[in-house]
């Protein structure tokens, strides 16, 4: 129930700026350009939220940008949710807080920083996490709903994470 309320808040916020809806045969995808949801059609509550907020029948794709509605065209958002070319990642028990408050994820030797605000839309503990490299979207995967978010790109960013007396300090 908490996730559907978070989703509804996200939809309302996205409609003010940028919102994309793309239906497929077994699922649909919604995105605001920074995060996205891939939701099976059997999850009718999520579909109902979108219908109520957009006043659309959800049979065709559309985007809303600056409160204007248009047809998308041939954009294939589905490939971003593909986990076959990504490795399983883990959530590190640290938060990086310099300019952004960011969560840290790790796959292989890569640390991937994600804006904490992008993670408020889901309960992380309900998902398996997959990541490629630090510049491609992370996929939070469950059998009914998958979620993607863009990482904070930190090229040549040198960081050192230290835990001092139970407190995390980042230099």
Which positions does each model-derived feature cover?
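Intrinsically disordered, low-complexity linker/loop segments enriched in Gly/Pro
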Residues: 1-25, 29-39
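C-terminal functional regions that serve as terminal interaction/effector modules
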Residues: 32-36, 40-41, 48-171
